[in-house]
Amino acid sequence: MKKNRIYFGLLILALVVTIVWTSAGMLGVNKEEKKYSVSVIVNDSNNDRWIAMREGLEQAAKDDDIQLNYVSTGVFASEDEEKALIEREVENGADGIIVQLVSSEDTYAVFEKIDSSVAVMLLETDAVSEGVYSVTAPDNLWIGEALAQTVLQDYGDSLSEKKIGILSGNQNQLSMQQRLGSVKKLLEDENIEPVWILSGQGENLSSELVTKQADEPVDILITLGNAETETAVDSISSFAI
């Protein structure tokens, strides 16, 4: 499969340099002069997808004299694992938490034990924050629509003859649900239905992709996020397309 046949949603973390500044601002306008501590917790923190964000945060933290703790994580097995990490960082003195939640469901439960004085910023989550938390995320409906439009424009009338597969990422996250919904809607409007849709992440998704492509090969692969794109690229050598 050629790289130009892999369509992906490139996550652009707009204004990443302002994130730490915003977190500090949420700690109070008339705050005392002190060095604030902000912890960053994201899924699979050493993944290359986070390099640009991490560099931006570190530079912003340096500029604003903030102690930044970029927490080393693997792929979270559950929400409880992530919740325990958040609570640990707060217990260790974090004044603010920047976090990418594993799931967008019941976000209140994740933070119910966190003191209200701790600033929380949800990253790439699109959870309903009810005015309590600051949310920074891309327009996921637009991303899904743009992906589908790109495929439609590239293939035109011949698209009806092509078989499409989708790597939909972590469908426990509202952001990925929205991207998938937009892609499916535009394809359905053209009477096109994907041959298969795979969800999940990491090694499990990679092995499932290789198996699925062997059993039900597709001509076009749409991936909804950076991690899914990397999985697809890493698996190209196994594809016969």
Predicted regions and their residues:
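Short beta-strand segments enriched in small/hydrophobic residues
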Residues: 26-53, 70, 133-134, 162-172
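Hydrophobic alpha-helical segments within soluble ligand-binding/sensing domains
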Residues: 136-161
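Hydrophobic alpha-helical
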Residues: 98-116, 200-241
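Structural motif
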Residues: 69-91, 195-215
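Hydrophobic membrane-insertion alpha-helices, especially the h-region
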Residues: 8-23
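Flexible loop/hinge segments that line or gate small-molecule binding clefts
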Residues: 106-142
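Short, solvent-exposed amphipathic alpha-helices that sit
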Residues: 49-66, 143-150, 174-192, 231, ...
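Structured, soluble extracytoplasmic/luminal domains of envelope-associated proteins
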Residues: 77-120
